[in-house]
Amino acid sequence: MIRGMASPKGRRCGKRWVAACAATAFLLGCGGGGGSSASFVGWPTVPAPGGGHEPAPDNQARLTGVFAGGPVVGLDYRGSVTGARKTDAQGRYHYAAGETLSFSIGELPLGAAPAADALSPLSIGGAISSADPRATNRLVLLQTLDADGDLNNGIQVTGAIRDIVSRHAAAIDFTQAATAFRASLAPLLAALDAAGAFTDLDPRPRSARSAVAAQEHYTRATAARNLVITTGGTLRGFESSATTWQYLGIPYAQPPVGALRWRAPQAPQPWSGVREAVAWADQAAQVQALERFGEGGMSEDSLYLNVTAPKLASKLPVMVWFHGGGFTSLTSNTKPFNNPNALVSKGVVQVSVNHRLGALGYIAHPALSAESGHGGSGNYGQMDLVMALQWVKANIAAFGGDPDNVTVFGESGGGRKVLSLMASPSAAGLFHKAISQSGTLIPDTRTLASAEAVGLALQKRLGAASLEEMRSRPWTEVVAAASVLVPYTNIDNGYLPYSERVSFESRRHNDVPFMIVVNTNDTPDPIETVKNVFPWMTAHSASRHYAALFSQVPGGWRARGVKTYHAGELAYVFNAPESVVTHYLLDLVIDPATGGKLAIGDLNGNGVSGSAGDTQDILASAGFDSADAKAIENSMAIWTQFAKTGNPSVAGLVDWPAYTPANDRFVELGAAPVVRTGLSSVFP
């Protein structure tokens, strides 16, 4: 990490920083060992008293450069005039005008270049673009070696890392193809793991970053930049489109690890200096196979959010997104959920939130209830969402958002989290509108005793003698032990002091304008909610409620009779046709003829079918057409209009009646919205 910045894993910057961002000192002048064709520039020396040599005296006027693409602390460099040094605690290197700088990690040479405050891989070593393997492989190595795994506070190369890299230098060849280079790092990473050289909170062995992830991080870090001052400190985001700024990996709470596991979230530690906001933070700890569906790593250190805002934003409505996956899975760290060309393009500020999941976020236990101070336990993931909303209230104005006009929305498990927040007194005043997409509400909330039984079952499966021992186990063991358990929200005498039924029927819930969305071929629980629970909610609410049946499905699948599946609306709301690939891989796209997963052949002739996971085949099979493009525009307009006004009616598109049990009115969202009657009869 960079000194002066916390390690919890606006205004436009000046031209000098933007110029530096166009370059990096991930130098391409030479390869490493194992096939490198260029030689390392030797260190300049002068005779030392008593014999031997030492670096040339630093009697030149020193200039300063900072590595773009992520400041690197502890990187070795030598100047032909100034001698040998390491980049300092802010990732800076110093040089004299006219000298040559050579960089290395211990004995592993990285390259050399004429000294300047901005060193570019495109101007050193003949690279054509940042996709040149010599550039990409250096990016992969440096980002992989970051000691604490948090690229938002820079890359830290410690002495231990430097020494072990030196011992493996001969095996590192920067001229290899990306896949081969990544594989070649396995022995080095195994040695670093064995030595305990990494300090991040993921107990799993460190793996090399992919070439795509490394290039994307470099692109974000070298884009135009923007500063925002928050209650925690100053953030530096990046230009995510010509009209938007984006800020990734913003901490809204302390890492819930060690003694903070299974406790209410704690306010984050502030930082001094500037914290970068260009790297995805970790996804919440969960089944490891699901990591591929999101960006960033995976660990308990996951209490971060992302903000996307128009460049000229001023007091715009705010939309806060909660991801699906029940209470156990998935992440908000996806490109579709943070698409700058989606909802934000319609005049809102969007926030996406990650929070604790599964047994780490939603179990209770008698010992936890005894220590909590409110006579209950559980709902830690929901408490995270409350703290994220508190962060939004305190900080979103700095990004151009209106803290008094906040809409929470989510799909599937995210919709369920929205409904839970509507029932919680802890969330009072933190949001002003709500959208539940395929969410489920069970009015008779799980009791504390029932939830504590799940916690006791987890303890037994862990073979732990005490709560202290449970807290000491790696998250990977906790997730594995909870594989057959079903943790979710419960009455806890704190976040939920009473059942959701009591909350609504006593009218103590957060009574805000509400829109419920269900898909034509949705799963049973959301259908049950829209048929039987939604009318009950409306009867106990003063605010207007609206209902939508989403029926649009991509053209290619529409032609095969596929009905809109669970999560099917997300491709439209987030202007992300590519998201149907994830939906398909999660077995959500159903063949009406068989009731099973839709079969997709080898449409591009590469020998791998869509059914076997070829993403190009899946997207081609979906076949988005002009009707889908229209549905995308309509969906974004409707969702953002509701966020702006509390009414989804859009002039010239749809005059949306509020739902009541008496009128039974809803809107079907196909290629064009149509007002209909008979929500209660849509599903048999």
Briefly describe each language-model feature range:
Residues 415-427:
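Short glycine-enriched nucleophile-adjacent loop
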Residues 221-376, 584-594, 601-602, 607-608, ...:
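Non-catalytic accessory segments of hydrolases
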